[in-house]
Amino acid sequence: MQWQQRDALWLLAPTQAKGVIQFIGGSGLGATPQLSYRRLLEAMAQRGWLVQCWSYLPGFDHQLLAVQAWRGFRSQRQEQLPVLRLGHSMGCKLHLLAPDQGRGAQAEVLLSFNNFAADRSIPLLGELAPRLGVTSEFSPGPDETLRIINSQLPQRPRLLIRFRDDQLDQSRQLLRFLPGGEAFNELQQLGGDHLTPASAGLRQQWLGGLGDGPRQRELNRLAEAIEQWWQQRGD
């Protein structure tokens, strides 16, 4: 399998696809998802998924980014295949803000959901903005994002995954606002930290077998957790 680019999308297609993964990575990492998330996405492709990942540069208007991502995926839609939306960190937020409210997918998997304010996400902004007399916040901001999630999203299968050593994760807060709450949405905890999904495998590439280790095992468990949940979920 070889990565192919279609405008802002990077595609990885197995010989026979059983479904489509629409992936959005985190802020910064999402600019080159085919590199930053290579091992996870290739593991999913090896399990029979057609992987589509959207590349983007971070900005303050998250609603605009969400619309752009949705349009990008829509331009490459495979109507005969089921769709799983997969996001990491800020990518979770962008999927949840999609203009179709998730109706274009059968399910969503959200890794390390993050919904911090701009001054928390960009520490220097918190220091400079008061001095410059300006205020900058993501649109929508954290509170408005949760209100949109709670009031506009339909109830559908969603898997939230947090990592044991992740200090940035807000999955538990998200679970309280998702339609259906804990009764309908599942939260799993795996070993790792906030960057576990983004392990690119550079050590393995440079060092061969010496590069294998905890990161690879964490990624294998993550890919398997996603696959098992997809197979067991209720439609």
Regions inferred by a protein language model and the residue ranges of each:
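Catalytic histidine neighborhood in serine/cysteine hydrolases
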Residues: 181-206
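Gly/Ala-rich beta-loop-alpha elbow adjacent to hydrolase catalytic centers
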Residues: 86-95
